[in-house]
Amino acid sequence: MFFSLAAVEVGTHLYWEIGGLEVHGQVLLITWLVLAIILTLAILGTLKLEQVPKGVQNFLESVFEYVSGIAKDQIGEYHYRPWVPFVGTLFLFIFVANWLGALIPWKLIHLPEGELAAPTNDINTTVALSLLTSISYFYAGFKEKGLGFFARYISPTPIFLPINILEDFTKPLSLSFRLFGNILADEIVVSVLCLLVPLLIPLPVMVLGIFASSVQALVFSTLSAAYIGESIE
């Protein structure tokens, strides 16, 4: 049993060399699959638009309304519309990626090195998503207020300058590590339980993982929208 537990690996990757750089091949494979699923849904939902939506169109319109509600609540009624595509893209990518990691037994597919898993299982993916949020935060603030945006760093007093600067650095860090840690921990727990008790015990944990995956997509997109709303206040 203890030798089986040693088969649960963390941090091993299938490396590809692209343009002289080493990239995590298994992350790219599942990322392309996530993008293909989202693109397929978008095409199927817009092929034949109907006045009374049904099927995939109805599902996509429900997702759009849900994401629009998140953006409107966090960014504000007068500024949220241009940011709906960004918030929606974050939500859909993380949601689909997390669900793929929670539902599909990737360990059944053997690679020369490493293991297939959700892209959000890799810290590079979550950091990249967080950096996009951080860039959007500064872009929104600078676009709305110009150079006056930077006055927030010395508000209410210049003494808070280092604290305010540090706060902007910790935002992407907290976003990335929260998502990465939750998804990685869930997949490790499921892997260990599958090795110990392969049949019944892992099922409740997998259901909990599916729920947690959905919550993480909501938390990440909501906080991203909240940061953008904060920058344009």
Swiss-Prot record:
- Membrane-spanning parts: 27-47, 84-104, 122-142, 192-212
Record's keyword terms, sorted: ATP synthesis, CF(0), Chloroplast, Hydrogen ion transport, Ion transport, Membrane, Plastid, Thylakoid, Transmembrane, Transmembrane helix, Transport
- State the compartments where it is located: Plastid, Chloroplast thylakoid membrane
UniProt keyword Membrane, yes or no: yes
Per the record, what is one GO cellular component? proton-transporting ATP synthase complex
Q: What is its main location?
A: plastid
Which Pfam families is this protein grouped with? ATP-synt_A (PF00119)
- Give any GO molecular function from the UniProt entry: proton-transporting ATP synthase activity, rotational mechanism
Q: How does it assemble?
A: F-type ATPases have 2 components, CF(1) - the catalytic core - and CF(0) - the membrane proton channel. CF(1) has five subunits: alpha(3), beta(3), gamma(1), delta(1), epsilon(1). CF(0) has four main subunits: a, b, b' and c.
Q: Which HAMAP family match?
A: ATP_synth_a_bact
As for family, the record states:
Belongs to the ATPase A chain family.
Tell me the NCBIfam families matching this sequence.
ATP_synt_6_or_A
Q: What is the official name of this protein in its record?
A: ATP synthase subunit a, chloroplastic
The species this protein was found in: Ochrosphaera neapolitana
Encoding gene, per UniProt annotation: atpI
